[in-house]
A protein has these predicted regions:
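HIT superfamily nucleotide-processing domains
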Residues: 2-9, 30-161
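Arg/Gly-rich low-complexity intrinsically disordered repeat tracts
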Residues: 10-32
């Protein structure tokens, strides 16, 4: 049952078609990389949940709720809806097993999804365990989670992938 999930998350064994677009991660030295690109490149440490050739998922260190995950394309683009259609499809397929793992790992009604894109100029999806719509209120105060708590959350989600 878990083998298809691991196959999908592992680009070497995935039988899903990769996005056909010729988008590539930005390599220009003229513009600074976004914080998400620096996380993907390993310049900034993160609590990685999953990764494949095109996408990267990691914990938000200022979570709305415990289990808040960010899913980002490795290609830098400011607006999620500027991605080619095949990338949009693939990012949701990449996020789906992570969302299901979040639902299993935390006491919630479902995993909420949000696309806002105002704080970081790099397309991303928020996956948040929720019990009601107020749990996705990004105006509420958020505090930085401790490294110990983030590590526990990371392990909890990964255990359900």
């Amino acid at each position: 049952m878990l083998k298809p999930l691991y196959d999908f998350l592992n680009p070497r064994t995935s039988n899903l078609e990769p996005p056909t677009s010729n988008l590539q991660p930005r390599t220009s030295n003229f513009q600074p990389m976004t914080i998400f690109s620096r996380i993907i490149a390993g310049e900034i440490p993160s609590y990685k949940i999953a990764e494949n050739e095109h996408f990267f998922a990691f914990l938000d260190i200022f979570p709305l709720r415990e289990g808040h995950v960010l899913v980002v394309p490795k290609t830098e683009t400011d607006n999620l809806f500027d991605l080619p259609a095949d990338y949009l499809q693939q990012i949701l397929l990449f996020a789906q097993p992570i969302a299901k793992a979040i639902e299993k790992a935390f006491d919630c009604n479902r995993c909420g999804i949000s696309v806002i894109g105002l704080e970081v100029p790099h397309a991303h999806i928020h996956l948040v365990p929720i019990n009601n719509a107020n749990d996705l209120n990004f105006n509420q105060a958020k505090s930085q989670a401790s490294p110990e708590d983030l590590k526990k959350v990371q392990e909890k989600i990964i255990a359900h992938l």
